[in-house]
Amino acid sequence: MDWSFFRVVAMLFIFLVVVEVNSEFRIQVRDYNTKNGTIKWHSIRRQKREWIKFAAACREGEDNSKRNPIAKIHSDCAANQQVTYRISGVGIDQPPYGIFVINQKTGEINITSIVDREVTPFFIIYCRALNSMGQDLERPLELRVRVLDINDNPPVFSMATFAGQIEENSNANTLVMILNATDADEPNNLNSKIAFKIIRQEPSDSPMFIINRNTGEIRTMNNFLDREQYGQYALAVRGSDRDGGADGMSAECECNIKILDVNDNIPYMEQSSYTIEIQENTLNSNLLEIRVIDLDEEFSANWMAVIFFISGNEGNWFEIEMNERTNVGILKVVKPLDYEAMQSLQLSIGVRNKAEFHHSIMSQYKLKASAISVTVLNVIEGPVFRPGSKTYVVTGNMGSNDKVGDFVATDLDTGRPSTTVRYVMGNNPADLLAVDSRTGKLTLKNKVTKEQYNMLGGKYQGTILSIDDNLQRTCTGTININIQSFGNDDRTNTEPNTKITTNTGRQESTSSTNYDTSTTSTDSSQVYSSEPGNGAKDLLSDNVHFGPAGIGLLIMGFLVLGLVPFLMICCDCGGAPRSAAGFEPVPECSDGAIHSWAVEGPQPEPRDITTVIPQIPPDNANIIECIDNSGVYTNEYGGREMQDLGGGERMTGFELTEGVKTSGMPEICQEYSGTLRRNSMRECREGGLNMNFMESYFCQKAYAYADEDEGRPSNDCLLIYDIEGVGSPAGSVGCCSFIGEDLDDSFLDTLGPKFKKLADISLGKESYPDLDPSWPPQSTEPVCLPQETEPVVSGHPPISPHFGTTTVISESTYPSGPGVLHPKPILDPLGYGNVTVTESYTTSDTLKPSVHVHDNRPASNVVVTERVVGPISGADLHGMLEMPDLRDGSNVIVTERVIAPSSSLPTSLTIHHPRESSNVVVTERVIQPTSGMIGSLSMHPELANAHNVIVTERVVSGAGVTGISGTTGISGGIGSSGLVGTSMGAGSGALSGAGISGGGIGLSSLGGTASIGHMRSSSDHHFNQTIGSASPSTARSRITKYSTVQYSK
């Protein structure tokens, strides 16, 4: 930015202000005369008023008259009249008086005397301009006269001697005290700025303190303060103004600093070891004096010591009492020592202070023990009674000279009963007892009478004396006797049972056959008891009561009884398993289905198969025997557990469960007969799903539905025709969206069994009569073909001589039992609409039902992929469905519900998006084992032997798809696994149930025939009908699904 322009403008503005201030303003006012119409100009000039100039400052302590006049005032009114100037204020008409005077004519103000700033730092002079009448011509003016300061005052300390204190061993830079000094000179001026300095320290060994020159704070220089070395310091501090300059004024003060004591000295005992002697059985109040030395301040808690025992005084024989005046500990004996128990003692003592140690020496403190060796001197001791009193029991049937007990004195030197003493009775109330002078045996002098009992009140207390004539010593013992009531006089005392407990804790007992008397003595009171009669019996008493445990058991019993009705409601109570009234949990991965009776007709009745018992062959057998045929599977299925038996499998369990289930793939066996049913999702109900794959599956399903809906003709909407009147009948605008719909009668397939006959008539089907029940069966049993039998590619497969002729019958007939019975429909939880069933039966007398043998390998996760759309050329499925090239290279194949274990699904199952074409092949419900997808749809080799089925249903081809008839093949053999294929469609395709050669799916294990019959021609005009679209050149084919029900006999 260019500042030159702004500089020029600023200079011009300042110049104009200066010119204006120093010049006069003249204003011309125009006066218009209305009488004569003339205009006059009057000039009005404003003159600048000069009132005063700034007053000059006065320095204190000097003669300022040379600066007179220090100020001058002037009023503009002086030009027109006479003006008198006057002043007032401090120093004029207020003390101090007469410092300032004014010339009333000229307005000059003069100073007349010396001023002191410390007395009056400034003066305020009030100036007035008066006329001759004494009236103010101007407003009063305040004139300030400032007094300049000079350094004429020294610093002054608030105290001549400052006192402070600080603990020893304090950290460096610890605040001790703050000095306070003031200066009367002008504040915030160099003349009043004080600088502090320590000029002397006592003792002066080394400087221990520092002072802040600006604030006067005294702090420690280091942490070497030691009260034991110097207890007090004296400092001399100087304060100088003008910040300590040489021309400044100064003052001094004293500082006394006391060093406070802390517990930084570890106390110790004067001697490290002591040796003393003491006689046994004596007490001593001043056995030993222990002096403690501590360098801390005397009589303080840091100096007072406490002596304590570290070890050796476990019996609490000694105590130490401290003298706080001398810091001396006195060792006392408070409990007699026994020479026989111990001859010497080693005491270990330690010392500490009452106060806690300072943190500076806390880590240095280590406990130092001092040893005291105590020697116990033996003395000759007299006998004593231990314990000093004993209690006995005397019964009413005890007579004269009966023994009450023994009370002997013990020799303390040997610890045994004394043999040098004699015993005499001391206090003996009622003269009841007598004592043996040598043995100390107590006996009754006479039988206790009732009068003695009443006199003593049942309690006797006497004394016994032991006298040692050699030592001239006597010991006294106390005898306590409990006299029992005289109500027990009838008891007999034959032989006493005496049990004595001595002071050593040992029990001695003597017993006889009769338990009449028992004498007991305890350690504490030495109680001897004599119980007459059946004493042992009296000790036994019943103590039976109803406690909390019994109450708790009763409450628990009632609670269990309350749970019985609830348990009866929950359990089946012997009812049939899987009863119709119960609920069956639906697993997460189960595929729901609408049963045939959900559409029309009653629910089929379940059949009893309890008599169907499989016969288990030996473990080394390679075949599976068939089950006796006594019923037909309707709503019941059997769960089986299998074992591998080499080439075949052995069934180890059989369970009857009500429900609907389809059979799996038949096993390779030497003979097989019965009804074959398809698998269902019930077999994989317990398996989990791969959620990532399921998410992809649902996305593909949604795309397929979108593409399908886009290709379908819309109903109930206005059709768009490119050329009106061409390809559309007259009056076609209406609800009929598709001409071909008039001839579409596929909706009759879903009407149910009630309308089956009507549907057959509408479709023009040929009606076959029911079989005669008296038709004789053949006697030949069906035998499965060997595993290595080559299947036939086209045409009809060779029929085994063991089978009867193949007959196409209606859905209502079914062979079972010894004759031909009317069958119930085979229900599949996944079967919507009609299905194609291939049945093989024998002509023997007894037809056995099929045995559905499951693989004992854990079921893999099964993923259902529905409507995966892709072109045939991109999928490269010619190896699996052998069909000729279609007329359009962009043929589309729609595969619905491809069921395979998810653990082995390859990435090649994802087929590219289809292109529009006029020919469409729809394959629905393809259930393919991984072993059968060896071609372009390669699977993981670990599932090569999976026993699964492939069912292809509703194969719809366009007008150009005519080469499928009789040439359909599926590549990739299953190996040892059998397969049943059922294919339906509008084209003339066929699938051989006996087998397909060329590496196709081997069906040799079935031994029957499976054919597709009653298929409508694909040359229907429905596939040539042009669907309305936006472009006339785009042709699309409508997909019509056909399916019928056939049985091949």
Curated annotation (Swiss-Prot):
Extracellular side: 50-548
Cadherin domain boundaries: 50-158, 159-270, 271-385, 386-497
Residues with Phosphoserine modification: 579
Subcellular location(s) per record: Cell membrane; Cell junction, Desmosome; Cytoplasm; Nucleus
Tissue specificity note: Expressed in all suprabasal layers of the epidermis, with the highest expression seen in the granular layer (at protein level).
Propeptide segment residues: 24-49
Biased composition (Polar residues): 494-508, 1024-1035
Leader sequence residues: 1-23
SMART domains: CA
Keywords for this protein: Calcium, Cell adhesion, Cell junction, Cell membrane, Cleavage on pair of basic residues, Cytoplasm, Glycoprotein, Hypotrichosis, Membrane, Metal-binding, Nucleus, Palmoplantar keratoderma, Phosphoprotein, Repeat, Signal, Transmembrane, Transmembrane helix
Desmoglein repeat repeat residue intervals: 813-839, 840-869, 870-899, 900-927, 928-956
Alphabetical list of PANTHER family matching this protein: DESMOGLEIN FAMILY MEMBER, DESMOGLEIN-1
Entry function: Component of intercellular desmosome junctions. Involved in the interaction of plaque proteins and intermediate filaments mediating cell-cell adhesion.
Protein name: Desmoglein-1
